[in-house]
């Protein structure tokens, strides 16, 4: 998992509340267990028309937001059914941070496991970030995880809270396997001790 310290990039405004995981990645893309290639399915029912052509009105199809790294979204983002493909699709598209007032619990947890930073902010702060994100090509936000703050294009700052353990994992790029390997020396020491004490086993 890639480390997450400071992220600077274009932020796209998605002013829709209750975006569920089926909207993020529709069910027809769930057949694969690969984490790559799912970016094409991200918001596919909003990004594409019935004939397969792009919907120019959807924010991620607009030139200023095609390479967005940050998504500023409406309340209760990622609600609905459990599907880890949702953060996979966001990550494959290039999005590493989602900012909202609240998230679906399972989606929120899955984001951390896949190297995406979900940030909860107040409605007042979200409205300010929407204003920043609506600047198009100038909608650059800086996400400073070590200092737990979001910096806008005009230098304005929004502070955010994060669980210290999850912060540690993101900064060091630790997924479940990485966490285990971080404790490898302790595990090896314990196993050696066990072998000595239970040589008969």
UniProtKB/Swiss-Prot annotation:
It is an enzyme of class 4 (lyase). Pfam families: Aconitase_C. Disulfide bonds: none annotated. Its EC number is 4.2.1.33. Keywords: Amino-acid biosynthesis, Branched-chain amino acid biosynthesis, Leucine biosynthesis, Lyase. NCBIfam families: leuD, PRK01641.1. Belongs to the LeuD family. LeuD type 1 subfamily. This is 3-isopropylmalate dehydratase small subunit. It comes from Bradyrhizobium diazoefficiens (strain JCM 10833 / BCRC 13528 / IAM 13628 / NBRC 14792 / USDA 110). The lineage of its organism: Bacteria, Pseudomonadati, Pseudomonadota, Alphaproteobacteria, Hyphomicrobiales. The gene is leuD.
